[in-house]
Amino acid sequence: MPERDPILLTPGPLTTSRMTRDAMLRDWGSWDAAFNRLTKSVCADLVRIAGGGDAYVCVPLQGSGTFAVEATLGTLVPRDARVLVPNNGAYCARIAAILRRLGIAHVELPFAEDEPASAHAIDAALARDARLTHVALVHLETSAGLLNPLDDIAAVCRARGRALIVDAMSSFGALPIALAASDIDALISASGKCLEGVPGMGFAIVRRSALEAAEGRSPSVALDLHDQYAYMQRTSQWRFTPPTHVLAALRAALDQFFDEGGQPARGARYARNCATLVDGMRALGFEPFLDARAQASVIVTFYAPADPAYAFPAFYAAVRDAGYVLYPGKLTTADTFRVGCIGALGADEMRGAVAAIGGALESLGIAMR
């Protein structure tokens, strides 16, 4: 018998539905009118989910979410700008690394890995340095599962007259975001996260006026969002070979997203998954890294067992043998591992994951204390 697909307890790629996978069985011509309509419908729905309205446009881009982050920063941020980067994890640090490579001045505002970015501290930083023109914020720092207070920070940026660019890679579709109401300049996410598509397409939902002002600014040909959007407006086509099957899967995933009840229902299911997971893991003796007030219901970081018998590779393999795939830790201050709560999963799968983890502890002789 063929091996059953493992359940991915990761923040993307993730376990997808049969309907989403089946959508990839058809081949599409990248210049065909039917595929152009598919692109248009997906982009319209992404703007709708973001609460963007007519003032915003969606620019899809081939590649991972990081491709879209770099494309957005390289296109929207002028070379003489100065960007504030609140930093409480690896994905915030990645934004700083991109800005460094682009030659754009930036200031990192450090926070602990378990500390949400403070809107008050950001306000103070903007008040101290009038040269700061933009804030680049990670909404949900996936290295810990930490939720940053987007609405409060957006209000500070609006009051200070600074542009706000949001990496919503692991929050878009699961958490409420009101793009136009928050006056955000750009929001970035990807197909293979909380929308429950497959990896391979990033996208930016950008204020139309900001994008139109960015002609010729990007130092890259392939990552130029302005040129990508302008070409799509003229031709209804992608500039370069599109990820046709990825887009078709995302169309199917979006249909299921709306059938489920949109963001409120998706977020509620993930919250149930998260609560089921945390309760079960605590019963085994594990403790979450984050305080519950800072924890997003997308991925949970747990402290690793202190027992010398614990080693993540063997622990991972034992859980994998039981049909579940964990995610390694990505923190600098503690030995941890991560368990995702997203994908085409419910509370039953989370209970199964807890049982698999308990079985791994027993089989490896790991004592929890």
Curated annotation (Swiss-Prot):
Top-level taxonomic group: Bacteria
Positions bearing N6-(pyridoxal phosphate)lysine: 193
Signal sequence region: none
InterPro entries per UniProt: Aminotrans_V_dom, NH2EtPonate_pyrv_transaminase, PyrdxlP-dep_Trfase, PyrdxlP-dep_Trfase_major, PyrdxlP-dep_Trfase_small, SP_NH2Trfase/AEP_transaminase
Reactions accelerated catalytically: (2-aminoethyl)phosphonate + pyruvate = phosphonoacetaldehyde + L-alanine
Protein family per UniProt: Belongs to the class-V pyridoxal-phosphate-dependent aminotransferase family. PhnW subfamily.
PANTHER family cross-referenced by the UniProt entry: 2-AMINOETHYLPHOSPHONATE--PYRUVATE TRANSAMINASE
Function, as annotated: Involved in phosphonate degradation.
HAMAP family: PhnW_aminotrans_5
Protein name as annotated: 2-aminoethylphosphonate--pyruvate transaminase
Source organism of this protein record: Burkholderia pseudomallei (strain K96243)
The encoding gene: phnW
